[in-house]
C-alpha cells in the first residue's frame, strides 16, 4: 500500500512539474514555423503570451489590444502554414485530425468536445487574427479546466 501511495505521489509531482514548465511556454513555440511567423508578423518572442497568460486570463487585459492582435496574427500564421486555416476559414476536419495526433484524444474524450465547442464559438468571426487567438485561448483554457477537474476528482 505504501508503494502504491508513493507511486501516486510521484505521478502527481511529475504532472505538476510538467504543467508548471508547460505554463511558461510561449503559445505556438513548439511548432515548426514559429520563428518564421514571428518574423512575418514583426513580433518578438517577448510579445507572445505564455500558456499561463492565457489560462489565467491575463491575455484579456484591455491594455493588451495590440499585443492580443499580434499574438492572434502569429497564431493565424501557424494555423495557415499547417493547413488548418485559409484566410479566416477553419479546416475543421484537419484541425480535429491534428489535435487527435497531438493529444492522443479518443472518441468521447471531453477535449474533443471542447475543441468542437471552441471552433463553433469562434467560427463566425471575420478577423482572422482575433479568431485564431480566441480559438487557441479557448482550447488552452478548456484543457486547463479539464485537467484541473480531473486532478480534483483523483484527489477526492
Swiss-Prot record:
GO terms for cellular component: extracellular space
GO biological process: response to pheromone; social behavior
GO function term, MF aspect, one: pheromone binding
SUPFAM superfamilies documented for this protein: Insect pheromone/odorant-binding proteins (SSF47565)
Compartments it resides in: Secreted
InterPro entries reported for this sequence: PBP/GOBP (IPR006170), PBP_GOBP_sf (IPR036728), Pheromone-bd_protein_Gp-9 (IPR022354)
Pfam family, any one: PBP_GOBP
Disulfide cysteine pairs (residue numbers): 37-77, 73-129, 118-138
Keywords: Behavior, Disulfide bond, Pheromone response, Pheromone-binding, Secreted, Signal, Transport
Gene3D superfamilies: Pheromone/general odorant binding protein domain
Superkingdom of origin organism: Eukaryota
Residues in the signal sequence: 1-19
Subunit relationships: Homodimer.
Record-stated family: Belongs to the PBP/GOBP family.
Cited function: Colony queen number, a major feature of social organization, is associated with worker genotype for Gp-9. Colonies are headed by either a single reproductive queen (monogyne form) or multiple queens (polygyne form). Differences in worker Gp-9 genotypes between social forms may cause differences in workers' abilities to recognize queens and regulate their numbers.
Entry protein name: Pheromone-binding protein Gp-9
Organism: Solenopsis globularia littoralis
